[in-house]
Amino acid sequence: MAAEPTKAEIQAVFKRLRAAPTNKSCFDCGAKNPSWASIPYGVFLCIDCSGVHRSLGVHLSFIRSTELDSNWSWFQLRCMQVGGNASANAFFHQHGATTSDTNAKYNSRSAQMYREKIRQLANAAMSKHGTDLWIDGMNCALVQPAEKKESDFFAEMTQPSSSWEATPASEPTSTTVTTVTRTISSPETADSASAECGPSVDILSTSPKAAVEVKPSLIGKKKVNTAKKGLGAKKGLGAQKVSSQSFSEIERRAQVAEKLREQQAAELKKEAEESLVSSMRLAYQELQIDRKQEEKKLQNLEGKKREQAERLGMGLAARSSISHSLLSEMHVIEQETPVANKSSRSQLDLLEDASFTSGPPKYKDNPFSLGDGFSSRWETESSSWGSADKAEEEREVTISSIQPARDRPANRRKPEGAPAPESNEARMKFASAKAISSDMFFGRENDAEYEARSRLQQLSSSNSISSADLFGDPNAVNLSGGVSLGNVMPAADITHFKQGVKSVAGKMAVLANGVMNSLQDRYSSY
C-alpha cells in the first residue's frame, strides 16, 4: 500500500491548484478565496457552501478543508488534480444542469455522471503516476516548498513560448493540461522550476534584439482573454444574455393572457345579466297575473265594499307572491243576538253624561265590548242594578268615540232573524228584586214566598221600616211610585258608581280610538 502524502506535499498541490483563476472563487456562489473542497467533484467551495454540501450527505459530496485537514489520501489529491472548477462548470453547462438549487443540482443525472467521470480519471492517474506529486510530467516542480530560492530573471523572461501556446484561445480549457500550463506563470512555480534545473543560459545564444522582441509577445499572449471566453468564472451558473426579442415575446404572451381573462370575465358577466333579466321577467309576469286576479275580485264586489277597497287600495298591487290581500278576506261581520239585557234603559237614562253614547253592536272580534263579566260584577255589588230582565233582547251599550251607532251604515247590521217580542211581565215582576233565581224567573216558586223574600231583600238596607213597608200596604207613598234611584242604590254608592263609569268610559274611548287608527293605517298601506 502506498504511503500517505505528507503535509508539505498536500500544501504544494493545493498551492498550485488554487493558483488557477477559476479556482480562486467558490464553485457554487462565486465567493473569493475558497478554502474547502468537494472531493467527488474536484471543486473548491467557500465555508457557507461547504455546510450545504455536508447536509447533502457523503454519498453525494464529501467535504475537506484545504488548509486545516492533513489526512488527505493520494486518491483524494488525484480527484482534485483531474477536476477543478473550470472542468466542472463546463460539464454542467454542457449537460444543462444550470439551476441554482443546490439540492436539485447535485441530485441530478449530470452530477452523477460527473462524479463517475472524476472517479475514473482519478483511478487512471493513480495507476499511471502512483505516488508522484504531479501528473503532468513536470517533475521539476516543488519538492521542498519551504526552502526559499532566488528568482532567476532570465528564466522568467526566456520561458519557451510553447508553454503559453499549449492551449489555443478557441480550444476549451476544461482539461488538466490547461490548468497546469496556466499556473506556470506564477512566481512560485518559476522558483520551483529553477530549483533543480538551474538558471537558463539560452539568452547568451540569442541576439539582444530577439530577446527584446520576445518580451512584448509574451506579455501580449499573457493578456489574452481566454479565461473570460471559455471559463465563465464571473457568469455564474448558466446565466444567459436576455435579448429584446425574449422581452417582446413575454410581453405579447402577457397581453394575450390578459385579453383571454377579460373575455372570460365579460362572458360570465353577460350570463349573470341574462339570468337576472329572465328571472325579473318571470317575476313581472307573475305580478301581472296576480294583479289581474285582484282586479277581477274587485269588480265582483258590490256597492260600498268596492268603494272602500278602491279608497284603501286593498289588494290592487301585490308586492310579492306572498303578499297579503285584504280584498280576499273582507266579509260582513254579523251582529250577535244578545242573550239577555245587562242593564235597564231607565237606569242608564239617569246618568246624564256626555261621554255616554250608543255604541256599535257587539261583534265577534271586538276586544272592547262589555261582556257578561262586567255586568255580573255590577249586579252583585249594586243594590238593585241587576234587576234587569235577562229575557229582553236589546243591543249592548258600548263606548265609542269614533262614530255613533246611529250614524253607521245600515248594511253593517244584518240580524240573523227577527227578534222575539219583548215582554214587560218579567221586568215589572223583578223590578225591585236585588237578585233572582231560575225558579223565581220561570215561576216555579210560590208567589207569597217570593213576595215576602223580595220585601225582606228590599228592606235589608233600610235604617227603619214600618208595617206598611213590611206587609206591602198599597196606600203607602214610598211604594206607589215607579223605580227611583234611591230604591236602586244608596247615595254614596251612586256617586262612586258615576265616577267609576266616567273613568272606565274615558279609558275605553282612548283605547278604541287608538286601535281604530292603527287598523286604518295598517290596512290603508296595502
Swiss-Prot record:
It is a peripheral membrane protein. Residues 247-314 form a coiled coil. Residues 165-180 have a biased composition (Low complexity). Residues 11-127 form the Arf-GAP domain. PROSITE patterns: ARFGAP (PS50115). Residues 97-526 are annotated as: Required for interaction with coatomer. Residues 405-416 have a biased composition (Basic and acidic residues). The keyword Kinase does not apply. Keywords: Coiled coil, Cytoplasm, ER-Golgi transport, Golgi apparatus, GTPase activation, Membrane, Metal-binding, Protein transport, Transport, Zinc, Zinc-finger. Its main location: cytoplasm. Interacts with the coatomer complex. Interacts with the C-terminal appendage domain of COPG1. This is ADP-ribosylation factor GTPase-activating protein 2. The lineage of its organism: Eukaryota, Metazoa, Chordata, Craniata, Vertebrata. The gene is arfgap2.
